[in-house]
């Protein structure tokens, strides 16, 4: 069975954020991921991890802004990354530097740098070309900085239905960027939810990309409602078998992040009651 990490931004939302660590451990998770750590004291986050025997395996670099209030405000205003946005290179670098400080303190091996949104006012090939040039340059710099402390930078294709104008949508696009940058610590965060919506053929995509060594992290959710992975059109039990099979063949050892919205998530114990899919997968 794959190794599952609880996404604390979406799971256990009936609880205050810091209490979600204990809830995840109680349900048998050994690792966690979430969007952003910046609004919380580092010592408190580390204490929650240690007290509950959890590994921090992923979080995001800031979507915009350079301090906790600015980051929260940027996310609330719809910012979804600065990596591909011309003119915001200094903001991107400051955000990555902040993320690396948190990653070092939390011993987190992976940081997801969201690509950002294409402008509404400028469309077409010229804008995409400029965005890609900035994206590659920023990621090359970020990978170099992250390598100094043994961290990996991740990029994630996200479907345009949930996130219109997001710069990166397809797996092949992400892998092309990773190959162009050429840094061994730049990898793809492959979310099977987004992959199914944009491309489908998820099992074959897993067979194609996991053996490349360019996939650093997987995420799952049911399609189309983004509930538990066994709700909707994806056959999650089969996909878990594919992951196990391919991982055994190629040595892939990554985590599978549970980035979904539980159907009963707002109810006390709702996340826990929805975890039957995990037991069936084992």
Language-model-detected regions and their locations in the chain:
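Active-site gating loops and adjacent loop-to-helix segments of metal-dependent hydrolytic enzymes
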Residues: 65-84
């Amino acid at each position: 069975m794959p190794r599952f990490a609880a996404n604390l931004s979406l799971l256990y939302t009936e609880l205050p954020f810091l209490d979600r660590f204990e809830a995840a451990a109680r349900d048998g998770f050994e690792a966690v991921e979430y969007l952003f750590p910046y609004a919380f004291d580092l010592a408190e986050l580390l204490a929650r991890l240690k007290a509950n025997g959890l590994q921090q395996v992923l979080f995001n670099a800031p979507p915009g802004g350079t301090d906790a209030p600015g980051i929260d405000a940027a996310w609330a205003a719809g910012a979804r990354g600065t990596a591909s946005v011309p003119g915001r290179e200094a903001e991107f670098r400051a955000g990555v530097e902040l993320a690396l400080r948190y990653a070092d303190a939390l011993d987190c091996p992976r940081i997801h740098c969201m690509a950002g949104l294409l402008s509404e006012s400028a469309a077409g090939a010229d804008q995409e070309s400029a965005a890609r040039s900035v994206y590659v340059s920023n990621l090359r710099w970020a990978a170099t900085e992250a390598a100094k402390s043994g961290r990996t930078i991740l990029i994630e294709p996200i479907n345009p239905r949930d996130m219109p104008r997001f710069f990166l949508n397809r797996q092949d696009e992400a892998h092309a960027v990773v190959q162009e940058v050429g840094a061994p610590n730049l990898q793809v965060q492959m979310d099977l939810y987004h992959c199914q919506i944009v491309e489908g053929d998820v099992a074959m995509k897993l067979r194609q990309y996991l053996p490349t060594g360019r996939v650093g992290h997987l995420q799952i959710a049911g399609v189309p409602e983004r509930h538990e992975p066994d709700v909707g059109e994806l056959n999650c039990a089969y996909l878990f078998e594919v992951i196990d099979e391919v991982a055994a063949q190629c040595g892939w050892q990554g985590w599978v992040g549970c980035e979904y919205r539980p159907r009963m998530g707002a109810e006390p114990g709702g996340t826990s009651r929805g975890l039957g899919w995990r037991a069936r997968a084992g």
